[in-house]
Regions:
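A short, well-structured juxtamembrane/interface segment
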Residues: 50-65
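Glycine-rich phosphate-binding loops that contact phosphosugars or nucleotide phosphates
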Residues: 73-211, 219-223
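Aromatic/hydrophobic pocket-lining residues that form π-stacking "cages" and hydrophobic walls in ligand
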Residues: 61, 157, 215
Length: 319
């Protein structure tokens, strides 16, 4: 990967081409402009469906690495990098993961979240350097995110990941025929030309966010962070999340809010441990030991001790 791709004509890339549907965008009445965007924003979902085999392969490969002590890194610049940071930041509260398990690495660091630092994306060695500063190693996973597939910062990081035996996953919105990327798993979300030519924060950004939602959630399901469709490892850190935890206990274990609150207090805020205690009758110490031995999936831990959750899962409404 060269240190810079300055002077390269990217006009042939799918993400840079002009969309014929929006040639007169500036002349459209507002209602027609909105309708055009609504219709065009169906493309990210279709792109995701076409990429389903690669996404499934990525979920299984990442989950296997994380189950063996590895970590997941998202690497990107601009919108792509910000989306990676956003997804990584949601994992600790949703799945009670340590913040270092899933990390978003953005060209330019934290200041680039608020102020554009797109010039930094042209430095291929910067991607490798930012990963090395975080101790990125052979047991880890990298998802390199670049809508147009040509970002040197991301390509340098992917090349480094492959060179040390880490799992390298590319995520781009152009075809591999147009732009090959160094990777083990290649996710291509072909959303087509943007309504504002080249503005990949639009459809490409939407598809990227959807893919990251799927990857992180799928991995956490595989790691036992979800029972049925409930986030049984939710971090109880505020009133809303405490309420959600109490409703999970009510719906799955059939306990009252008062009983649920007592169980949460006994379990140190662990919903999964509280559910096991409610279903099995085990006290805290043996329940914790049982979960450590037979988890992390609650279903497996329950099966081993012959316990069943007495509640019937109820749909959770929007919060």
């Amino acid at each position: 990967v060269s240190g810079s791709l300055s002077g390269v004509d990217r006009g042939h890339l799918l993400t840079e081409q002009a969309n014929p549907l929006s040639e007169r965008l500036d002349e459209l009445p507002t209602d027609q402009l909105v309708a055009l965007f609504c219709a065009n924003d169906l493309e990210p979902q279709r792109a995701l469906e076409r990429a389903a085999p690669a996404l499934a392969a990525a979920v299984d490969a990442i989950a296997a690495r994380l189950a063996s002590g590895g970590r997941l890194f998202y690497l990107g610049a601009g919108t792509s990098g910000r989306l990676g940071v956003l997804d990584a930041a949601e994992c600790p509260p949703t799945f009670c993961t340590p913040p270092e398990l899933v990390q978003g690495v953005l060209a330019g660091g934290a200041p680039a979240l608020l102020r554009s630092s797109e010039g930094l994306e042209d430095l291929a060695d910067a991607g490798q350097r930012d990963l090395e500063e975080r101790g990125f190693g052979p047991g880890d996973c990298l998802v390199g995110i670049a809508a147009g597939g040509t970002t040197p910062y991301v390509l340098g990081g992917l090349q480094h990941a492959r060179s040390i035996g880490a799992l390298a996953i590319a995520l781009a919105c152009v075809s591999a025929d147009q732009v090959p990327m160094p990777c083990d798993i290649d996710i291509r979300l072909l959303t087509g030309p943007e309504l504002v030519a080249g503005s990949t924060r639009l459809k490409a950004g939407t598809a990227t966010k959807m893919a990251l939602n799927l990857l992180s959630t799928g991995v956490m399901v595989r790691l036992g962070k979800v029972h049925g469709n409930r986030m049984v490892d939710v971090a109880v850190t505020n009133s809303k999340l405490e309420d959600r935890a109490l409703r999970i206990l009510r719906d799955l274990a059939g306990v009252s809010r008062e009983q649920g609150r007592a169980l949460l207090q006994q379990s140190g805020g662990s919903v999964k441990l509280a559910l096991l205690m409610a279903a099995s009758g085990l006290e805290l110490a043996p329940a914790r030991a049982h979960l450590a031995r037979h988890g992390p999936r609650l279903r497996d831990a329950l099966d081993v001790c012959g316990a069943q959750l007495s509640g019937s899962p109820q749909p959770q409404g929007p919060q």
